[in-house]
A protein has these predicted regions:
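Small, basic N-terminal interaction modules of short regulatory proteins
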Residues: 1-4, 58, 80, 98-99
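Residue-level recognition of specific faces of alpha-helices
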Residues: 14, 40-43, 60, 85
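Arg/Lys-rich, positively charged N-terminal/basic patches that mediate binding to nucleic acids
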Residues: 1-34
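Short, hydrophobic secondary-structure boundary micro-motifs
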Residues: 31, 52-54, 95
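Enriched for short, Lys/Arg-rich terminal
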Residues: 73-99
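Basic/aromatic recognition patch in beta-strand/loop cores that engages polyanionic ligands
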Residues: 39, 46-80
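Generic structural signal for secondary-structure transition and capping sites
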Residues: 20, 27, 42, 46-49, ...
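Alpha-helix N-cap/helix-start and coil->helix boundary motif
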Residues: 12, 38, 89-90
Length: 99
């Protein structure tokens, strides 16, 4: 099945904040982070069922190299994948449920 991927506005903020943080630590590291996230978005788009449901119909794809999970939901009725957020794995999981 072919899906369309939709990003909630907060996803862009998550990526920008994390990019800025990594760049403040090591020049160019933020760019590497963004590249890893984009690659994971491609995997989600082409193989969303690869990731199991973790909570409230939400699946989590973990990035390689960086400790982040991409939280998304598959909407079968519209053939859409909605990316809800990008969270550091050490953050309080209660934050996930608030979005």
């Amino acid at each position: 099945m072919k899906y369309e991927i939709i990003y909630l506005p907060l996803v862009y903020e998550d990526i920008k904040e994390t990019n800025d943080f990594y760049n403040s630590r090591v020049k160019g590291l933020g760019k590497e982070f963004v590249a890893v996230v984009k690659e994971e978005f491609k995997t989600i788009l082409h193989r969303p069922l690869l990731f199991e449901i973790k909570y409230k119909n939400t699946r989590i794809a973990y990035t390689k190299r960086f400790p982040f999970g991409i939280h998304f939901e598959i909407q079968e009725n519209t053939n859409r994948i909605v990316v809800k957020g990008l969270y550091h794995t050490a953050r309080n999981s209660e934050i996930w449920y608030e979005r």
